[in-house]
């Protein structure tokens, strides 16, 4: 009886995440490669999505992109957002790109002080 109760409590606390066969297969292929890649750039628009995708999906390396800023000091030719609002847009763009290319996204706390040319 106690075992059944403990098992019931344990199973209610464990989060079961359903994965497709393709996702499981891709995760298994990553076990055959030991290594990681960190792509580092100053601004969100300096990323190389093709390279990140190659390392994440073909080489099966643990791959991440570190953007030193969130792009809040950049220019915006297609909208009115500047400053922090532009940084929010650029941040969401990078997070969406990582969902597609399979990399992880990281940011530093550096502040983008604007266009310098």
Predicted ranges, named:
Residues 2-13:
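Bacterial N-terminal signal peptides
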Residues 14-18:
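Sec/Tat signal peptide C-region and signal peptidase I cleavage site
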Residues 19-117:
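Active-site rim/loop-helix segments in enzyme catalytic domains that contact anionic ligands
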